[in-house]
């Protein structure tokens, strides 16, 4: 696999300390970790993560019962993370602008696309809405 993505409970909570332990010849080239709070994102970066996913930004059916991290965490990530990061969780066309305005330049979308009545159209809408975003 080119990319390996792990949740906090899959890595740190399971005793992992450095993503270097996951790297091997023929193994993943990029390793990312989920985070739900600034301390987890900081720990992921210190542990060698190539990227960090922050969320869920809003309530989402893919993580029922998990509290939303809010746009404040997106703002924190934009100001503090020096590795690529992705906003994820509950993103939709209705709230996308607020996520981008908070500083996100990369997003992950699941439900708003997979639950759409016209999946290709939903994908095109997200791509169109993201076309103005510039990475730093």
Question: What do these predicted regions represent?
Answer:
Residues 2-3, 28-32, 51, 84-86, ...:
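Structural preference for beta-strand elements that scaffold enzyme active sites
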Residues 11, 16-37, 65-93, 126-136:
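Alpha-helix-loop-beta-strand connector modules within alpha/beta enzyme cores
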Residues 26, 47, 80, 101-103:
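Structural motif
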Residues 31-63:
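Histidine/lysine/aspartate-rich catalytic loop segments that bind and position anionic ligands
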Residues 39-42, 75, 121:
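A broad detector of short, well-ordered amphipathic alpha-helices
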Residues 43, 77, 98:
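Hydrophobic/aromatic ligand-binding patch that stacks against planar heteroaromatic rings
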């Amino acid at each position: 696999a080119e990319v390996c993505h792990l949740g906090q409970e899959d890595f740190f909570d399971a005793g992992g300390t450095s993503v270097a332990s996951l790297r091997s010849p023929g193994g993943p080239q990029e390793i990312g970790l989920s985070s739900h709070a600034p301390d987890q994102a900081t720990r992921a970066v210190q542990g060698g993560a190539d990227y960090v996913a922050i969320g869920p930004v809003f309530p989402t059916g893919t993580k029922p019962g998990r509290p939303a991290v809010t746009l404040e965490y997106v703002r924190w990530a934009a100001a503090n993370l020096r590795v690529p990061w992705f906003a994820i969780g509950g993103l939709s066309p209705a709230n996308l602008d607020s996520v981008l305005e908070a500083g996100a330049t990369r997003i992950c979308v699941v439900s708003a696309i997979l639950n759409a009545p016209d999946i290709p159209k939903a994908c095109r809408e997200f791509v169109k809405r993201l076309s103005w975003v510039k990475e730093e």
